[in-house]
Regions:
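N-terminal catalytic or cofactor-binding beta/alpha core of small enzyme domains
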Residues: 1-137, 152
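Small/polar glycine-rich anion-binding or flexible loop at a beta-alpha turn
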Residues: 138-142
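Active-site-adjacent mobile loop/cap segments within catalytic or ligand-binding domains
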Residues: 144-154
Length: 154
């Protein structure tokens, strides 16, 4: 079994680190016999999804865990939905500031996760890890990445 884990490069003027990548980078190379492959993605509306799709074709993992940073959240929050919308308050790392536009002009309004999110949250709680289901991945690059992933899997 191969599990792909992704995190993001620093963004928004923070050149030191992005906690999403720090968490992924700290993972062991194998867990319970599964090979863990790790990639750091660009914080760009278009580039993150394109890079993830390239990696998916190359690595052909059995599972994907895309880790992002949600400022102010004090828990692990698996996402329920990716929406077809880009809007941010800071430019991405290519300098692009989206102020309200679709990710795909003819794409569906949203993609919903098919993961057993409540069971995942319960398992995290049982392990002593704060967790809650998130109903919004926002409208920045994390959302664009999740939308691209769900589109790729559809």
């Amino acid at each position: 079994m191969k599990i792909l884990m992704t995190g993001f490069e620093p963004f928004g003027g923070d050149t030191a680190m992005n906690p999403s990548w720090s968490a992924v980078e700290a993972m062991q190379a194998t867990i319970a016999g599964a090979e863990i492959v790790k990639y750091r993605l660009p914080v760009t509306y278009d580039g993150a999804g394109k890079e993830l799709c390239r990696i998916l074709r190359e690595e052909q993992p059995n599972a994907v865990i895309a880790v992002g940073q949600a400022g102010g959240r004090a828990a692990v929050t698996p996402e329920r939905v990716a929406i077809n919308w880009m809007e941010g308050t800071v430019p991405d790392n290519e300098g692009r500031l989206c102020q309200g536009e679709p990710i795909r002009m003819a794409g569906p309004a949203a993609y919903f996760s098919t993961l057993p999110l409540r069971s995942i949250v319960e398992a995290l709680h049982n392990a002593g890890i704060p967790a809650a289901v998130s109903n919004s991945a926002g409208t920045y690059v994390c959302n664009a990445l999740l939308y691209a992933l769900m589109e790729h899997l559809a």
